[in-house]
Amino acid sequence: MSQPWRRGVRALSWTRVLPPRARQGLSASQTRCVQIRAAPAEQPASVNGDHLPVVATPNSAQSSDARFDVIGAPYSMLSVSLSASQNLYTRRGTLVGLSGKADNVSSASPVTALVSVRSPVTSFAVVHLNGSVDWMVAQRRALLAWTGRSLSIRPTINTSLSIAHWGSSEVTGRGLLALVGTGQLYSVELKAGEQYIVHPSNVVAYTMSSNPPRPYRFKSTTLKFQVPGLKSLPRFIQDSKFIQDMSDTDTWKGTMKLFHKIRTWSRMTIWGDRLFLQFDGPTTILLQTRGPRINEILTTHEVNEIADSPRGLTIGPRKPSEDKKTAEEALQPTPDAPSRSVDDLIQEVEGSAQRIATITKEGKVFFEKAGQKN
C-alpha cells in the first residue's frame, strides 16, 4: 500500500513541474489562470467633477543659505545644511547630530545637522517660503524646524474661527520650514472655485488666502442627549419653594455637572467625527494620514458649541465691509439733521455766551459781554 501511494504523490509532484502546454489536455478543464496585478496608484482623485491633484510632499527644499533634505524610509530624519551665517531653530529634544566645527552651538564654517522625533510613525515635509504666500500651521506639534532671517512665526488665535486656528502658528517671510505629521503627508492643491472638506485632525498646514477655512458639519443620524434642567419644568413647579431649595444644594449641582461631563464626552467620542473644515480654492493643504484625537484639537466648549449648531456651514461666508462714505457725502447734511449757519457753528465752538466778571472794592460783581465798552 505504501508503494502505490508514493507513486501517486510522485506523479502529482512531477505534474506540477510540467509546463502548461504539456498538461493542457489533462488539467485544462480543472484549472483556471488568475492574474493579479497592482492597481495603478497614479489616478488622480476628483473634486467638483474635476481632477484633484493629491501628490506626495517634496523631499527637499533649498534657499540661498540653507537646504532641507528628508532622508530615510519612511522619511524618518531631516538633514539640514547651513551656511556660516544662518540660524537654525528646532524643537527642543529633536537635534540628533551636528557635523562641522561647532563651538557653543555656533560655527564659522558650514555645518550639517540631523533632526528627528521620537515617534516611529511620523514623516516629514519641507516648505520653501519665498515671501509671496504665507502658511498657517494647524497642528500644535507639526512645527519641527525652520531657518531664515526674515522668517517670522507667530501664534494666532481667531475667536471667530477657533476650530481652524486652535493652536495654530502663522508663518510669514522668506525661508525654509520643516513640518512633521503622523503617518504619511500628502499635498492637496485646489484651484479657484473648487471646494474640499477635510477633518481638522488631518490638516497639518495650509496656505493663507482671502477665503479662510470654515467649520462644516455633515448630516448624520444623531441621538439628542439633553441635560434635565428646571427651565423644562412647568412654571408652577419652578416657583415652588422645594424646587428652589433643591437647586441650591450641592447634590443637585454635582449631578448637573456629571450630566454635562457625560454629554461632552459622548459628543467628543461618538459624534466628534462630524466636525469638518471646508476649504475654498485657490489654496494648498498638507494632510496627514493619521490624525490625533479630537480632544487634542478642540476644547470642551468648542465641541458643545459646534454640536448644538445645525448641519452645514457653522459660520457663513465673510460679508464685505460696508462702503465708507465719501467726503462729499459726509459734508452733505442728512434730511433728519438740523440745518445750522456759520454763526451757530462759531457760537458752538466759542461757547453759548461770553461774559467778563469785574469785582469792585465794595465787593460787588459786574458781568459784561466780551467787547462791550463801558
Swiss-Prot record:
TM ranges are: none
Predominant cellular place of this UniProt entry's protein: mitochondrion
Please give the superkingdom of this protein's source: Eukaryota
Would the keyword Nucleotide-binding turn up in this protein's UniProt record?
no
Q: Which SUPFAM superfamilies match?
A: TRAP-like (SSF51219)
Q: Which UniProt keywords apply?
A: Mitochondrion, Transit peptide
| Annotated region described as Disordered, given as residue ranges | 308-342
Q: Where in the cell is it found?
A: Mitochondrion
Extract the InterPro entries matched here.
AIM24, AIM24_sf, Trp_RNA-bd_attenuator-like_dom
Task: Mention one GO biological process in which this protein takes part, according to its record.
Answer: inner mitochondrial membrane organization
All disulfide bonds of the chain are none
Q: What is this protein called?
A: Altered inheritance of mitochondria protein 24, mitochondrial
Q: Which organism is it from?
A: Aspergillus terreus (strain NIH 2624 / FGSC A1156)
